[in-house]
């Protein structure tokens, strides 16, 4: 045994390391040095300040917080499983290396905020949005309750923290969804704050520790296999606290953004395209049937933004929108005619199975596919005059051989997402797609083509049980 490392392990474990502990943990000696040298008093002070600023309603004393922190940093002393020791070291290392910069900094005075004057009045456009959603309100409500509807009572506290976090870390964290629309239009109601960031796992682990230390309760971090780079934080009752998608820095750079009150939001034109896509998912249409007013305000806000930004005249002239698709049910591929627009491709093959797209891209021997991760939920490839892509939602049919207009709009929006993220001009097709929302009749759904079935195991980070699975 190396005497210096053995002494370090003795200091950390509070006991002489066994032979197996020594050999398994000796390569962790640098991380262990960081943990031992970490100033717990300063850390406890930061936790208390975070509690005072964002969780003041939580009934836990300063003494209890200190006990909780010190207890976790000595947890290894009563742990003899090598696997659990590895987990404790990994989580403690994340905490001592990142917490101050990620969440501790939120207790300091921030930069001056310059309130945005960008606010949108939706009175004139709300009737158009109402009519559009009335035509799309064709789903039969099921009794299934989606997990996203089980909300933790901690959400309001975390939202307050997230507002500050988005301002301090606006180079690597942006928001989208209802909160971003609330910044444009205070009529929009929001629940949790939806975010994209480049260090999602680190942030959520730090937040999990903060919640653990100031509430005394365990929270669990889950990685969902069928959503790309998605993690969700849940409380002890399995209620949703916050989720986050992780994206690469290069993806972050190509996303068009709008700065409002020192917070970057995903450009509402891109969000409108995502909303078009969302309506092709049958359970989202059930949400529409349950609460049409909530979605009406959101759709109207997005429509008003793009109307103003792109100078769109709302007259119902939709030209080639939505672009029509023809479904091959056996191959689960849709052939969409895009020739009506000046794109760099004449048609688009929309795959309903991601593995089939990946296989065909390999067969094409093409190496210039672009993947915008969960921003588009698909890779895109142009080969010849064809755009190849994958569509992750259900496809609705209005009769046995005809794709429903809702899904045609969704696929058209998916194609425009590619145009937006690659910096191409979208003014005319966007204008046409928005105008295609007008003067529609309600058409019932004949059949739902199921979405791609993803397989895989949930990953988990459980601080209390010392578990990390990938």
Curated annotation (Swiss-Prot):
Its EC number is 2.7.7.19. Keywords: ATP-binding, mRNA processing, Nucleotide-binding, Transcription, Transferase. Coiled coil: none annotated. The active site is at residues 192, 194. GO terms for biological process: mRNA processing. It catalyses: RNA(n) + ATP = RNA(n)-3'-adenine ribonucleotide + diphosphate. It comes from the Viruses. InterPro entries: PolyA_pol_cat_Poxvir, PolyA_pol_cat_sf, PolyA_pol_nucTrfase_Poxvir, PolyA_pol_nucTrfase_sf_Poxvir, Poxvirus_polyA_pol_cat_C, Poxvirus_polyA_pol_cat_N, Poxvirus_polyA_pol_cat_N_sf. It holds the Pfam family Pox_polyA_pol_C. Disulfide bonds: none annotated. GO terms for molecular function: ATP binding; poly(A) RNA polymerase activity. Belongs to the poxviridae poly(A) polymerase catalytic subunit family. Heterodimer of a large (catalytic) subunit and a small (regulatory) subunit. Polymerase that creates the 3'-poly(A) tail of mRNA's. This is Poly(A) polymerase catalytic subunit. The gene is PAPL.
């Amino acid at each position: 045994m190396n005497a210096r490392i053995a002494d370090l392990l003795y200091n950390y474990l509070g006991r002489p390391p066994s032979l197996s502990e020594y050999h398994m943990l000796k390569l962790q000696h640098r991380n262990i040095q960081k943990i031992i040298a970490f100033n717990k008093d300063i850390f406890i002070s930061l936790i208390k300040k975070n509690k005072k600023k964002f969780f003041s309603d939580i009934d836990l004393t300063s003494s209890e917080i200190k006990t909780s922190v010190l207890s976790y940093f000595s947890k290894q002393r009563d742990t003899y499983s090598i696997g659990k020791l590895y987990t404790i070291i990994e989580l403690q290392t994340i905490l001592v290396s990142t917490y101050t910069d990620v969440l501790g900094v939120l207790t300091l005075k921030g930069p001056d905020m310059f309130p945005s004057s960008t606010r949108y009045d939706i009175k004139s456009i709300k009737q158009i949005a109402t009519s559009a959603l009335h035509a799309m309100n064709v789903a039969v409500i099921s009794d299934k309750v989606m997990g996203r509807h089980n909300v933790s009572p901690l959400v309001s506290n975390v939202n307050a923290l997230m507002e500050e976090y988005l301002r301090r870390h606006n180079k690597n964290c942006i928001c989208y969804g209802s909160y971003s629309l609330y910044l444009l239009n205070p009529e929009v109601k929001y629940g949790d704050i939806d975010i994209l960031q480049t260090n999602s796992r680190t942030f959520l682990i730090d937040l999990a520790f903060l919640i653990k230390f100031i509430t005394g309760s365990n929270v669990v971090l889950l990685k969902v296999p069928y959503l790309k780079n998605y993690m969700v934080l849940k409380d002890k009752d399995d209620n949703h606290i916050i989720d986050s998608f992780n994206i690469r820095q290069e993806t972050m750079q190509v996303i068009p953004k709008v700065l409002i009150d020192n917070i970057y939001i995903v450009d509402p034109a891109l969000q409108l395209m995502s909303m078009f896509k969302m309506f092709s998912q049958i359970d989202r249409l059930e949400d529409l049937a349950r609460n049409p007013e909530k979605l009406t305000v959101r759709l109207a806000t997005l429509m008003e933004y793009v109307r103003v930004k792109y100078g769109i005249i709302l007259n119902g002239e939709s030209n080639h929108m939505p672009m029509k698709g023809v479904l091959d049910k056996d191959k689960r591929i849709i052939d969409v005619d895009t020739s009506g627009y000046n794109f760099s491709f004449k048609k688009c093959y929309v795959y309903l199975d991601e593995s089939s797209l990946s296989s065909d891209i390999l067969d094409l021997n093409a190496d210039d596919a672009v993947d915008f991760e969960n921003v588009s939920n698909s890779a895109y490839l142009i080969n010849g005059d064809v755009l190849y892509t994958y569509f992750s939602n259900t496809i609705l049919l209005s009769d046995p051989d005809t794709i429903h207009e809702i899904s045609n709009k969704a696929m058209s929006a998916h194609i425009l997402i590619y145009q937006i993220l690659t910096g191409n001009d979208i003014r005319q097709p966007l204008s046409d797609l928005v105008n295609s929302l007008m003067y529609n009749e309600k058409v019932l759904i004949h059949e739902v083509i199921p979405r791609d079935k993803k397989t895989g195991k949930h990953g988990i980070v459980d601080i209390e049980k010392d578990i990390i699975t990938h």
